[in-house]
C-alpha cells in the first residue's frame, strides 16, 4: 500500500507539472509483478488513455537497445572487433579523416567529433519545399523508404548522410565528448557482418528475449 501511494504521488505530480502526459509503471521483483499501473494520456490533448497496449517510441535509446546491443552480439560471435578502424568495416570511409579511428573510440565517445548534424536543415529550399533527392509526399520507386503515410525518403539518401559525416568537423580530440554520428553507420556494419538486414538481426535478438512488442516500424504489426 505504501509503495502504491508513493508511486501514485510521484507520477501524478509529474504529470501535473507537464513533464509528460502519461506513463505506465511496472515493477517486477523476483520474477513477479508487484506493481503495474497506467496513468494519464498519450498526449496533452487527453484523447487516448495510456493502457497496457500502449507502444512507446524510445527515440535516442535506440542507440543502446538496438545498435550497441547488435554490436555486442556480433562481438560475442567473433565477428566484430573493437580494435579495428572504421574503414575496416566501411570501405567508403577509407580516405577520410574518420577512417582510421578505432570503433571502440566511437563507442567510448573519444573521437572528438561533433555531437550531431541537423540533416533536416539541408532538405528544404528557401520556399520550404523539399529539395530533389530528399523527401516526397508520395511513394515511388525512387522514394521508397516509408516514414509516414505522406512522407517517403529518397532511397539513396543514406549516401548524403554518410557524406555529411565524412566531411564534418572535430570539436575536441583530447576529452570525452558525446557524439551520436557513429550510430548512423551501425546498421550497415551489422548487415555486412551478419548477412541480415539490421531490422531482422535486431528482431532475432528481441525474439530470443520474448520482447514481442519491441520492434521497428510498429505500424506494420499493430
What are these regions (language model features)?
Residues 2-56, 79-81, 162-167:
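Short, conserved catalytic-motif segment at the N-terminal edge
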Residues 29, 62, 86, 177, ...:
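Short, solvent-exposed turn/loop segments enriched in Gly/Ser/Thr/Pro and often Arg
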Residues 98-222:
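Short, surface-exposed loop or secondary-structure junction motifs
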